[in-house]
């Protein structure tokens, strides 16, 4: 039976939708003291990079037989999230490291949109779905790969369940941003893309004007770092350094960086890259110091631990320079893998729709 005969008079317009969302680098990451809820106050400048994730959400009856590697989400998790039956599969960079359980942010994002679709009486809201993630961003590397999965899944699921952009029940940008913030602190920026200043946990965003294109060499480390552990190490380092309360943002104000971004001059931007989490990340993974040194020796304008690490982002003068720096760091044995990318990049968006066949 074709999918067009399953749902009665109101049929889905699409059998599957694919969306993409980009990773990020933190050009400035100032970390304040821990809050009562356990999070830290942040003052950060995000910039989206060309590395991206692609997420496809498909109505499973439209997809036919499932891939042999497809993983079934546990029924208990589906019931707890009030979600439709779901399978998923993963391909691409570090695909074997992607969590294949209910902690997966892409699945949580789809479940959130399914809930809205159910409230709006969308007939296919409870239909089984398949989620496929094609990864292009390092896993657990401080570049928001999981958050990009969630952002892309939000966009794809919204288009699948609410194909009419004029429909009153379709979640708008503000509502998607609210859902994104519930999923994770970096997810709202992965929806927005471009360049933005983030405060609070990073979810309160203000777009920043940036001109020019910035070229990066990226060095990954397969050992990974736990974000909570890096923040814990920062707190311990600060407590050991001073009995006084830590300042709200040890990296200082990002206003100088914001001004430099308007010029489009990578040399000026490079002078102002700063990350309060770099020292604790190096403390937990001392080899990062050698990676940063190798980047400098290879001719990078500047190098910085990306977010909570362990990925190192190396700002370069040109795309050719980025290739040379990435190659040099790799040959020196100071990274598990290297790649190049550029910034800024666009917002999350739909890249493919498959119409339902009659």
Curated annotation (Swiss-Prot):
Pathway: Isoprenoid biosynthesis; isopentenyl diphosphate biosynthesis via DXP pathway; isopentenyl diphosphate from 1-deoxy-D-xylulose 5-phosphate: step 3/6. ATP binds at residues 138-148. It comes from the Bacteria. GO terms for molecular function: 4-(cytidine 5'-diphospho)-2-C-methyl-D-erythritol kinase activity; ATP binding. Its EC number is 2.7.1.148. Pfam families: GHMP_kinases_C, GHMP_kinases_N. The active site is at 24, 186. Disulfide bonds: none annotated. The keyword Ribonucleoprotein does not apply. It catalyses: 4-CDP-2-C-methyl-D-erythritol + ATP = 4-CDP-2-C-methyl-D-erythritol 2-phosphate + ADP + H(+). It is an enzyme of class 2 (transferase). GO terms for biological process: isopentenyl diphosphate biosynthetic process, methylerythritol 4-phosphate pathway; terpenoid biosynthetic process. InterPro entries: GHMP_kinase_C_dom, GHMP_kinase_C_sf, GHMP_kinase_N_dom, IspE, Ribosomal_Su5_D2-typ_SF, Ribsml_uS5_D2-typ_fold_subgr. The keyword Ubl conjugation does not apply. Gene3D superfamilies: 3.30.230.10, GHMP kinase, C-terminal domain (3.30.70.890). Keywords: ATP-binding, Isoprene biosynthesis, Kinase, Nucleotide-binding, Transferase. PANTHER family: 4-DIPHOSPHOCYTIDYL-2-C-METHYL-D-ERYTHRITOL KINASE, CHLOROPLASTIC. Catalyzes the phosphorylation of the position 2 hydroxy group of 4-diphosphocytidyl-2C-methyl-D-erythritol. Belongs to the GHMP kinase family. IspE subfamily. This is 4-diphosphocytidyl-2-C-methyl-D-erythritol kinase. It comes from Corynebacterium jeikeium (strain K411). The gene is ispE.
